[in-house]
């Protein structure tokens, strides 16, 4: 049956630019999908969006929608103009956790798409900044039906609200030669251990895990996660001098100096007269620029592990925060190594849950109570690698210095150092 299409003159303008338009995608569902229900839903969605553009006002409001046994994972959206656009008056979003490293098979994707077209609008986002697969547009009764079906063949809801959120990891060694750790294993162990905290919000605010296999940090873990695991190495960078000479012969000596040598932030690289490369590994800060420019000539070292940073977040209360190093280097090879990683995460979340204020991220708590108190609370000794910059004031308080020194020496003696 033909539907009465809403006029969308303002939305039509979004299709005139050089880039793909989400409006075109929604119109294809409205005009070409064989399911009349999806045609009607997307038609009213376009109508409401056009109305919002005309009035410069959003008409979605929140509410409470969940599936049995879960306290999160659904983003409720109810329309304030549902009488005018009845087919899209309930347009909830379902967050579904992706596989570690976003490794899918086409069969998995077809199965998910078929189930979503059966119950939802047909609109899917891979992936939001949360890391989830976002299934956008389902009414309240079909929310449970959709979840039941995908859960039967192995998928689970992601996090929403004050809980442990969906973890993310890069594709890792599956296609990246810079990988320094088993990203997918670390990802799965953390997610599996905190599944209950993902589904039942009971924390001060959100807590995110992200795992990047090398300092390139393709997952933006340093900037966007409360618990960032970054692959790294602590021995010397591996240099293939023959490939260095080949690169210089191909690009030219001046190009090499301008785009590799002078781009090193700590001036750790120098080019010899015979076109070989010297690396001052002590000064290398793992910025990865030279390795990215010359992936055949330069490679991470053999002594690989991870660096753990805590407290990254984007703007909310006190602006953007980069993660703070709490473990400069940790091997992840044995099962005991991975268990200790999970135990550290448990300790940090427990401390934050007890000491964080409502709606306060872990990094904001560290800013409030101080890094020294945070490290003491989670049982980690301070390390010079945790400093982001030298002291800015030469005036410091010395009261309590002797007692603090005695406590430090006592801890060192207890640890047998």
From Swiss-Prot:
ATP-binding among keywords:
no
Task: Tell me the first and last residues of the signal peptide.
Answer: none
Q: Which residues bind [4Fe-4S] cluster 2?
A: 264, 284, 287, 290
Which annotated residues bind [4Fe-4S] cluster 1? Answer: 170, 176, 214, 218
EC number from the UniProt entry: 1.8.1.22
Pfam families reported in the protein's UniProt record = NIR_SIR, NIR_SIR_ferr
Q: Which reaction(s) does its UniProt entry say it catalyses?
A: [DsrC protein]-trisulfide + NAD(+) + 3 H2O = [DsrC protein]-dithiol + sulfite + NADH + 3 H(+)
Protein residues bound to siroheme: 218
InterPro entries annotated for this entry? DsrA (IPR011806), NIR_SIR_4Fe-4S (IPR051329), NiRdtase/SiRdtase_haem-b_fer (IPR005117), Nit/Sulf_reduc_fer-like_dom_sf (IPR036136), NO2/SO3_Rdtase_4Fe4S_dom (IPR006067), NO2/SO3_Rdtase_4Fe4S_sf (IPR045854)
Q: Does the keyword Ribosomal protein apply?
A: no
The record's remark on the cofactor is: Binds 2 [4Fe-4S] clusters per subunit. Binds 1 siroheme per subunit.
GO molecular function (one): 4 iron, 4 sulfur cluster binding
The protein's required cofactors: [4Fe-4S] cluster; siroheme
Name the UniProt key words of this record, in alphabetical order: 4Fe-4S, Heme, Iron, Iron-sulfur, Metal-binding, Oxidoreductase
Main enzyme class? oxidoreductase
Summary of the function given for this chain in its UniProt record: Catalyzes the reduction of sulfite to sulfide. This is the terminal oxidation reaction in sulfate respiration.
| Protein name in UniProt | Sulfite reductase, dissimilatory-type subunit alpha
**Source species of the chain:** Allochromatium vinosum (strain ATCC 17899 / DSM 180 / NBRC 103801 / NCIMB 10441 / D)
Name the encoding gene, please. dsrA
């Amino acid at each position: 049956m033909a539907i009465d299409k809403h006029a969308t003159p303002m939305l039509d303008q979004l299709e005139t630019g050089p880039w793909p338009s989400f409006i075109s995608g929604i119109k294809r569902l409205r005009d070409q999908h064989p399911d009349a229900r999806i045609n009607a839903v997307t038609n009213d969605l376009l109508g409401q969006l056009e109305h919002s553009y005309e009035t410069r006002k959003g008409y979605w409001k929140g509410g409470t929608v969940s599936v049995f046994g879960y306290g999160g994972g659904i983003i409720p959206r109810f329309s304030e103009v549902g009488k005018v656009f009845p087919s899209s008056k309930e347009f909830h979003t379902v967050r579904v956790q992706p596989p570690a490293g976003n490794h899918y098979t086409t069969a998995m994707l077809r199965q998910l798409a078929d189930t979503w077209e059966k119950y939802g609008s047909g609109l899917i986002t891979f992936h939001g900044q949360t890391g989830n697969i976002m299934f956008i547009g389902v009414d309240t009764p079909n929310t449970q039906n959709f979840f039941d079906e995908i859960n039967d063949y192995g998928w689970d809801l992601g996090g929403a609200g004050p809980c442990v959120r969906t973890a993310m990891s890069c594709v890792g060694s599956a296609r990246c030669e810079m990988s320094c750790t088993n990203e997918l294993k670390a990802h799965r162990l953390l997610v599996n251990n905190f599944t209950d905290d993902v589904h039942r919000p009971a924390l001060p605010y959100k807590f995110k895990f992200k795992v990047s296999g090398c300092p390139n940090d393709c997952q933006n873990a340093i900037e966007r996660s409360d618990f960032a695991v970054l692959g790294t190495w602590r021995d010397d960078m591996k240099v293939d001098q023959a490939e260095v000479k080949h690169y210089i012969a191909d690009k030219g000596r001046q190009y090499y100096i301008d785009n590799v040598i002078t781009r090193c932030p700590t001036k750790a690289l120098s080019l010899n007269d015979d076109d070989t490369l010297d690396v001052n590994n002590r000064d290398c800060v793992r910025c990865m620029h030279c390795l990215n420019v010359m992936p055949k000539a330069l490679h991470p070292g053999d002594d690989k592990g991870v660096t753990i940073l805590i407290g990254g977040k984007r703007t909310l209360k006190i602006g953007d925060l980069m993660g703070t190093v709490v473990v400069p280097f940790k091997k992840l090879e044995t099962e005991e190594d991975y268990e200790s990683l999970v135990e550290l995460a448990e300790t940090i979340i427990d401390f934050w849950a007890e000491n964080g204020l409502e709606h306060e991220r872990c990094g904001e708590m560290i800013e409030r109570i101080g890094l020294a108190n945070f490290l003491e609370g989670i049982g980690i000794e301070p390390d010079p690698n945790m400093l982001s910059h030298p002291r800015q004031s030469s005036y410091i308080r010395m009261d309590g210095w002797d007692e603090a020194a005695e406590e430090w020496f006592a801890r060192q003696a207890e640890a047998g150092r």
